[in-house]
Design a protein with these regions (language model features):
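Glycine- and aromatic-enriched membrane alpha-helices
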Residues: 2-455
Length: 455
């Protein structure tokens, strides 16, 4: 069916050239990304044991409530306010948390730093500022929720909420600013990339770091925090001796399906416009995800003799993670390669927790940290461009690869150090349930509920 639209349906509107089409797409993308957090709750809930499924899902829903409030109050300001006010940030790490506190300033019609009333960061001049806030808020929410998979079945809910509030403030917002807000890991004149390889006539880095939708900010960040917590919190009783099997595999499959669906908002929405690049990102996201799912299943078949539904779901997530930073920089063939390698790497990496003795309960490290690192660094090999520096496999030199390795390492080091500090602040308050509570089930002891009442 062909839908007839008026000639001016997608023309810019407003004094600043804001686009109704772009605005509608970013709002839709924000809703899609928000839907990913309930999807993650199903994914993690299904992977958990029956006695802890509600707690696992509550950690995701708790993050949704807590981080949303914090982001409105000071989160956006800490990440992006310098782009609106023109003020300097603090050491390339953080913007002023009070400059846009509560966001009411973004509803005013007075001119901003560059004379516009719309969004003024990163070239998204066709989308109002408050719409971009909505989109960015959903990223912060799911990043915190992702970490919870590493502490499943043994961390107190209240302590988890306290940790999440501190962590998103001291780790997520600074890293978001560093990468996307003109900080140390951006293409700005004061960034690390500019110091390594110089700047062009406009003051931007000659070799710009590439993180299209959150390989560093979301996945390396969450994965590294998960590793720290898994090590410091300790193992579940019976780890390495008892098989902790998923209690509801249909939940896992449902969660993976919701995540895949929502990820189109995550990646395609990061373009900030309904244009050709958005189509490229959609295709690349699909290609990488499908390739990762298949390669994970091949690894399972060779290693274990079976291709499992949990493996398929995990492969989907690994592919989505890997393509996140690279989705706007690769060809479809490059995306297939990136995804296929991600599926293999993550399928092998999830076994490292048994070798090194850390209890990453739901494989946040093996999937998000490993695939996030590969996706970020793989850009230096597979990036395709006729104008900007390309990856090594497409005629480029070493520079893009070096920049990608540097931003990945900085993210790992920054998140690791800060998460250790936060963990030692929270730990004395009592962050782990007792052995008795763990045996009984954290659903009953923390929430006074059970998931299933079967006669």
């Amino acid at each position: 069916m062909v839908l007839a639209l008026p000639d001016d349906a997608f023309l810019p509107f407003g004094p600043d050239g804001l686009s109704s089409g772009d605005t509608a797409w970013v709002l839709t993308s924000a809703a899609l990304v928000l839907f990913m957090t309930p999807g993650l709750a199903f994914f993690y809930g299904g992977l958990s044991r029956q006695k802890s499924v509600l707690n696992m899902m509550m950690m995701s829903f708790g993050s949704l409530g807590l981080v949303s409030v914090i982001y409105v109050l000071w989160g956006y300001s800490m990440s992006f306010s310098n782009g609106h006010t023109g003020a300097n940030d603090i050491g390339g790490i953080i913007a002023d948390p009070f400059a846009l506190f509560g966001l009411s300033q973004l509803l005013e019609t007075k001119e901003l730093a560059d004379g516009a009333t719309g969004f003024v960061l990163g070239g998204f001049g066709t989308v109002p500022a408050i719409v971009w806030v909505a989109f960015q808020l959903t990223f912060a929410v799911i990043t915190v929720a992702l970490i919870s998979g590493a502490v499943a079945e043994r961390m107190k809910f209240g302590t988890w909420m306290l940790f999440g509030g501190i962590w998103v403030t001291l780790v997520y917002f600074p890293l978001s600013h560093m990468v996307w807000g003109g900080g140390l890991l951006s293409a700005s004149e004061g960034g690390i990339a500019a110091k390594l390889f110089g700047v062009d006539e406009e003051g931007a880095a000659n070799v710009a770091p590439i993180d299209f939708a959150g390989g560093t900010v979301v996945h390396i960040n969450a994965g590294m925090a998960a590793l720290v917590l898994a090590v410091l919190l300790g193992k579940r009783a019976g780890f390495g001796k008892t098989a902790f099997r998923p209690h509801n595999i249909p939940f896992v499959m449902l969660g993976a399906a919701i995540l895949w669906f929502g990820w189109f908002g995550f990646n395609v929405g990061s373009e900030g416009a309904a244009d050709m690049i958005a189509g490229q990102v959609w295709i690349n996201t699909t290609a990488a995800t499908a390739a990762a799912m298949l390669s994970w299943l091949v690894v399972e078949r060779i290693r274990d003799g079976h291709a499992t539904s949990v493996g398929a779901a995990s492969g989907v997530v690994a592919g989505l993670v890997a393509i996140t930073p690279a989705c706007g920089a690769l060809t479809p063939i490059g995306s297939l390669i990136l995804g296929a390698v991600a599926g293999v790497l993550s399928a092998l990496a999830i076994g490292l927790k048994y070798k090194f003795g850390y209890d990453d309960s739901l494989d946040v490290v093996g999937v998000h940290l490993v695939a996030g690192l590969w996706g970020t660094v793989g850009i230096g090999l597979l990036a395709y461009s006729t104008e900007e520096p390309a990856g090594l496999f497409y005629g480029g030199d070493y520079k893009q690869l070096v920049v990608q390795i540097v931003i990945a390492l900085v993210a790992v080091i920054f998140t690791g150090i800060m998460t250790v500090i936060i963990a030692f602040i929270v730990k004395p308050l009592g962050w782990r349930v007792t052995r008795e509570d763990e045996d009984t089930g954290i659903d009953e002891t923390e929430h006074a509920e059970t998931a299933y009442e079967l006669a």
